[in-house]
Regions:
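Acidic anion/phosphate-binding donor-loop and adjacent secondary structure
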Residues: 146-147, 170, 178, 187-203, ...
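Carbohydrate-associated surface elements
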Residues: 164, 186
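Conserved donor-binding/catalytic core segment of Leloir-type glycosyltransferases
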Residues: 196-227, 239
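Nucleotide-activated donor-binding/catalytic signature segment of Leloir-type glycosyltransferases, i.e.
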Residues: 251-269
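Short alpha-helical donor nucleotide-sugar binding micro-motif in glycosyltransferases
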Residues: 268-269, 276-281
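Acidic donor-binding loop of glycosyltransferase active sites
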Residues: 279-293, 307
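Short hydrophobic beta-strand element within catalytic cores of glycosyltransferases
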Residues: 308-311, 321
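Conserved acidic donor-binding segment of nucleotide-sugar-dependent glycosyltransferases
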Residues: 323-324, 328-335, 344-349
Length: 399
């Protein structure tokens, strides 16, 4: 049995983990869902949320202790201040709970979708005699804390959302490159498929974004760019699906720029509603800034629906689309270039169609979850020597 450990599962952004678990089961892999702590009941609006909570074992609050070797691991962390190491005793308790649960249900390997504290829990579980483990890095290393060498030292292998993260791991941690797999999270490209849309009118453009309302998502730059495009005579409309701490600031900006009739905030939406939004839009916007973004699943969903993307150069986005082929890559915080992209797409419907068709082809060839999940599974089997699929032997895959 393969355990999949995701911190605070399920949250609104966790649908791709559920897709991965479904793909693993279709491949004949018995899967146990694991998590650190139970999130609030309203933290995920997707239809799968209730079933996900029912199937998940939460290691916090823990049920037992006896992890003195794990305590030794914790106290040896070089980059974590002593005060935080002492507070980390709770992680030891969680590691012991995880160890006992793995023994109870027969988990042979744990794959952790985080390089933050959940990675410490898996490492200490292994020290206690628990199963082997692997990790996925979903963003820049600094976002996930410190002591990455300790987290990764015992890991059988590591996957990451893009080649740039593999380079970070090798450079900053010294982990062997041959044990690191750049791999996309993926999505169901059959479900996220284009609608039958006409070429559209010259001068009109419906934009969409699916993202949390956080400062790091750079919504303020996209909204300011909408104002510039409208001032150039284009009929641009913009719909954002997502919720977060920046909502009040975004609402004020919309008012200040006199865009209340053009920019709509939908709040959090489930998967079917996101699909509907994408299918009625002309183009997708990702204006993220700073660190932390890796291979945005929302960008994959939009490309799979045949939408051209106007997208920040951030994380793995240059590996996900080629500027001028599947969309437009824009320097971070560049309102003028965002606006220029909007204006061009508004005035050239044929360009929208050609970029969108290319985006769809790339999504199908690179981002389908069945292929990305199989690639991860084969990599884990290669580096653990385990045959996790019922009735199947190990396979090989290159990093």
């Amino acid at each position: 049995m393969l355990g999949i450990l995701v911190p605070e599962f399920p949250l609104q952004t966790h649908i791709f983990f559920w897709r991965e678990m479904a793909a693993l089961k279709q491949m004949g892999v018995p899967v146990a869902m694991l998590s650190t702590r139970r999130p609030p009941e309203n933290a995920c609006r997707h239809e799968f949320a209730a079933e996900a909570r029912r199937q998940t074992h939460y290691v916090y609050p823990p049920s037992a202790f006896g992890g003195w070797r794990a305590l030794s691991y914790l106290m040896k962390l070089k980059e974590t201040p002593l005060s935080k190491r002492l507070r980390g005793v709770g992680l030891v308790l969680c590691a012991k709970d995880l160890y006992l649960h793995c023994r109870r249900v027969g988990i042979r390997h744990i794959h952790v979708h985080s390089c933050a504290d959940a990675a410490h829990v898996a490492a200490m579980c292994n020290i206690l005699g628990g199963p082997s483990y692997s990790l996925t890095l979903h963003g820049d290393l600094p976002v996930y804390g410190v002591d990455h060498a300790a987290k990764m030292a015992r890991a059988a292998c590591i996957s990451c959302d893009g080649p740039h993260l593999k380079e970070q791991i090798v450079r900053e941690v010294g982990y062997p490159a041959e044990k690191i797999l750049p791999n996309w999270m993926g999505l169901d490209t059959h479900q996220f498929s284009p609608s039958q849309r006409s070429e559209g009118q010259v001068g009109r453009l419906q934009l969409a974004t699916v993202a949390r309302l956080d400062a790091c998502k750079g919504h303020r730059f996209a909204i300011a760019a909408v104002r510039k495009a409208v001032d150039e005579g284009c009929d641009v409309r913009y719909t954002l699906a997502g919720e977060g701490p920046e909502r009040a600031n975004i609402e004020r900006l919309i008012q200040q720029l006199r865009l209340s009739d053009r920019v709509q905030l939908l709040g959090t939406r489930g998967e079917s509603e996101v699909l509907e939004l994408l299918r009625r839009s002309d183009a997708f916007v990702l204006s993220s800034v700073g660190m932390g973004e890796a291979g945005p699943i929302s960008l994959m969903e939009a490309m799979s629906c045949g939408l051209p993307a106007v997208c920040s150069i951030i994380g793995a986005t240059p590996q996900m689309l080629t500027d001028g082929v599947e969309g437009m890559l824009i320097p971070q915080e560049d309102e003028a270039k965002l606006a220029a992209g909007f204006v061009r797409l508004a005035r050239e419907p044929a360009l929208r169609q050609s970029l969108g068709a290319a985006a769809r082809r790339r999504a199908v060839s690179q981002f389908d979850s069945a292929a990305t999940t199989r690639r991860l599974l084969e990599f884990i089997e290669l580096h653990t020597g385990l045959s996790l699929r019922e009735g199947a032997g190990s396979s090989t895959v290159k990093a």
